A protein has these predicted regions:
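Terminal alpha-helical segments
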Residues: 1-144
Length: 144
């Protein structure tokens, strides 16, 4: 019980965690009724955050301890201007981090939740093209 959990710091660690979150979001959206929109949006935010942190590691940046996707995207933009293309998706999703998960007053429509899910997949798709080594393709060293 004294063992510390392994620190997440490799791109692969971040990607695996992100994939778990997006898989949970997809599963809940497809199978649970009523649809738990806020929980799905939370998992979407978490997936996007972890994908971005994995990308930052590949870009040579230590990911900060933050849930703010705008901040993570801005850090990545310093290395590659192309990250501006996902900045609006990051801005939409960032609001669904920890607080909405516990705020019983937050209500999200299924339509809005599906939009959040779509933006998360936009971020993932961008990263698959921009930084393929995050997904096990290509050489990490060649991407910086």
């Amino acid at each position: 019980m004294d063992k510390q959990p392994k620190q997440t710091n490799t791109p692969e660690d971040w990607r695996i965690l992100a994939e778990r979150d997006i898989t949970v979001a997809d599963y809940l959206a497809a199978n649970m009724r009523p649809v738990p929109a806020e929980i799905i949006a939370f998992h979407c935010q978490q997936a996007a955050e972890k994908y971005l942190k994995g990308a930052l590691v590949i870009l040579g940046e230590e990911p900060p301890y933050t849930h703010d996707l705008d901040e993570l995207c801005s850090l990545a933009e310093k290395h590659r201007s192309t990250f501006v293309s996902i900045s609006s998706s990051c801005s939409i999703i960032t609001h669904f981090s920890v607080q909405p998960r516990y705020d019983r007053g937050v209500s999200l429509s299924e339509e809005d939740m599906r939009l959040v899910l779509s933006h998360t997949k936009t971020i993932k798709g961008f990263l698959q093209k921009e930084i393929p080594s995050l997904f096990g393709e290509g050489q990490q060293g060649m991407e910086q």
